[in-house]
A protein has these predicted regions:
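Aromatic- and glycine-rich beta-strand/loop motifs that create alpha-glucan
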Residues: 1-30
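Cytoplasmic juxtamembrane interface segments
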Residues: 1-11, 83-93, 159-163
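Hydrophobic, small-residue-rich alpha-helical packing segments that form membrane-like cores
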Residues: 10, 14, 96-99, 135-136, ...
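Alpha-helical membrane-interface segments at transmembrane helix boundaries
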Residues: 15-18, 60, 84, 148
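Membrane-helix interface segments
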Residues: 22, 101-102, 139
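Secretory targeting signals
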Residues: 28, 34-77, 107-163
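Helix-loop-helix units of permease transmembrane domains in multi-pass membrane transporters
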Residues: 80-115
């Protein structure tokens, strides 16, 4: 397998996904909804239940849980857009006749979707860390964000993308 071709296809796919206004709108509105929900559930002024702020793992866990829901919607949207874009003419003419096999092509496209989802996940974790530090009474532990990213968000992304 040629990793240069995989990187090229992944970069092309991630740019294509980020330029899609429907995907971008749903992703940004989903991040805003997650931010508002977390602020309402775990903020200082709106804390609904004590168990949502008593543990240092509460804020990163709720963030990972809400992001997994958003991630499932985004993967469905990205794969449906993938199929419709390939049916339309002139969207992938530069790559349609390709000097690489289909495994490289599918790996690159899946990696492109994964890169976009990982960036959105990092942005969601940064927003949750901001809530945790500045707007919540919950204790902060930065390693828990990494833990829930590795044990919840990343495996969910692998499962949803079909790897």
């Amino acid at each position: 397998m040629n990793f240069h071709n995989i990187r090229l296809i992944a970069r092309y796919e991630s740019k294509y996904i980020c330029r899609n206004p429907v995907f971008l709108g749903i992703a940004l509105s989903g991040l805003i909804i997650i931010f508002i929900m977390q602020n309402l559930l775990q903020g200082k002024e709106h804390a609904g239940a004590w168990f949502l702020v008593s543990l240092s793992s509460a804020v990163p866990f709720i963030n990972a849980y809400l992001f997994m829901i958003l991630q499932s919607v985004l993967v469905i949207l990205a794969t449906s857009e993938w199929r419709t874009s390939e049916k339309r003419a002139d969207t992938l003419e530069a790559l349609r006749v390709h000097p690489f096999n289909n495994l490289v092509y599918i790996t690159g496209k899946t990696l492109g979707v994964g890169i976009v989802l990982l960036v959105l996940n990092l942005l969601s974790m940064l927003l949750a860390a901001g809530i945790n530090l500045f707007a919540s009474d919950a204790p902060f532990d930065g390693l828990l964000y990494l833990f829930y990213g590795v044990t919840l968000s990343f495996p969910a992304m692998l499962f949803l993308t079909g790897l």
